[in-house]
Amino acid sequence: MKRLIILLFICSITFGQTYPSGQNYPPPTDLITVPTAATLMRGSFSLGMRIQDGGGMILGLRAGITDRFQFGLSYGSPNLIGDDSLRWYPRPEANLKYMLIDESISSPGVAIGLNTQGFGNFNQGDSLNRYDMKAYGFYLSASKNWKTSLGNLGLHSGVSYNFTETDDGDEDPNLFFGMDIELNPEFSVLMEYNAALNENNMTTETLAISRGGYLNAAFRWTFVEHLHLELNFNNLLFDEDKVDYFKREIKIIYIEYF
């Protein structure tokens, strides 16, 4: 019950606010799972709801403390919707980001951050203590954007190190890449690749559901100024010996001002 109250409290804070006129719309801070170098503007916040396969749900709240620094928390369950015994993730997870270098015409923006929220089931058996898809952990990300005839085109890359999910014996740093392109003011296409270099030793390969990293794609629809609706196609490089198909998820992002 305490955990359910946490989720309801996050919702009540978020949807009880109003959006001031004349403000610029904050840039997206993530692709599908990959963090970009962008941060929420000061005084803005976002509520994200990720609906996973198996009835799982992750709810996250993030706030722009300054124009460079954002802070957030997330919490959820791998099987919130369904008829089997309800399981919660073991703890709320943190999301911090600070923009080190502003993007310019000739150079990308650079940010450092911490994201401890993984995806899928949380595996506690055999003292693994990790998500199906590990969190990014501590990361350094870079982003560069250009204007095209269709809209914005963004390229993103970064390196990360997960220090909270190492009981499986794989402590390697990781790499990630991504891009987003606007088709019109409402629709965007997102692509990303998580190399999953911290899931490729002999022990973790038996757990990994990907084959050579995670390739994800998504369509994002901004049908009103405050709201993104996203259809995700995750793990397109799935291991056919372990899973039958790639993952389909829905993500809803609501952005507002204090």
Indicate residue ranges for each PLM-predicted region.
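Transmembrane beta-barrel domains of Gram-negative outer membranes and organellar outer membranes
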Residues: 17-153, 160-164, 180-258
